[in-house]
Amino acid sequence: MSLFWELLYLFKRTPWDTGLTPPEIVAMVESGKVPIGRALDLGCGTGTNAIYLAQQGFEVVGIDVSRRAIALARQKVRSAQLADRVRLERGDVTLMRRYAIGHSLEQSPFPGGIDFAFDIGCFHNLNTEARRRYVSALTTVLKPGAIYMLYAFEPQADRRGVALDEIAVLFDPAYRLDALRRGSDRHGRGSAWYTLIKREAC
């Protein structure tokens, strides 16, 4: 799978890499619902959103499977003079615990966990078992009350996606769905923004 993404970045077949932070992320940050703290960018690509959050005062860990994407992201972070606020890791998002908090919270660069996590188009590419591992790891690294935003395509007959009922099964009972905004891409494929909040007891 990682070779697939390397080739897309090599040949610049990356229409999602717009260089712009989605207005949904900007609105969440500007709303004040997320405390300025620690953020996790899952499937960070070339770092656009990690850089935006660092500019707003967050400490950020970004994870992506593509070496080329991470190399480009590191260049952008250095150019923005934000290397002290953004840590970029090439790896498997289902192993996010390793990158976000280390082997234990006591050893963590982010002791106490993550305040805000988001995923723009990574989760929907995972298979069912990987999605389970992802949610388990996410629940470990997020603080109680943390906000998680997910942008995902809806499933089609020949393409992976994420349906609302799957969100309910995978994320319950550790999370509650706070908001759902449906839409579509420029080709008319259905998509949605999910905003979930980790329950205090989980």
Predicted region positions:
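Conserved acidic residues
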Residues: 115
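A conserved beta-strand element that flanks and buttresses the S-adenosyl-L-methionine
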Residues: 118
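Short catalytic micro-motifs in class I SAM-dependent methyltransferases
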Residues: 121-125
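Class I (Rossmann-like) S-adenosyl-L-methionine-dependent methyltransferase catalytic domain
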Residues: 1-40, 46-112, 126-141, 146-202
